[in-house]
Amino acid sequence: MSIPASQLPPLTEATLWQILNDELEDATVNQLLWHCLGYRYDPHTQTWQSDRVPPEWRQDYPEPPDFMGSRPAIVKLTRSIPPAHKQLLKEQLGFPGYEIKELTPRRTRRATAVNWLLSYRATQAEAGAK
């Protein structure tokens, strides 16, 4: 099941910090990522539509993956961030990273999700400027 796009939180700095600070549910973080990747839930057929999803994602994940619970999915997300966008978490949010003692798979996945969302936002802005 999916939250309607109109009810997803906006991709603002506040939302991104909520993700980093573990103030948004994993399900909401996943659904933000799914929406940005192009996955759409059809409540009438109760199926996921992936016609807007890039082929490299659709091939591996015909249905949206659980990014917060799946290492392979989050690794693919990490690898899909263009090199020019790898530091957006630091550059745009001033995120200093975690100390070694604070590192957990959950926090790392949330930081990856935020960096990918920042990359998505930057890519959309670049496409709109052309």
State each model region's role:
Residues 58-130:
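Low-complexity intrinsically disordered segments
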Residues 2-57:
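Calponin-homology-like cytoskeleton-binding modules
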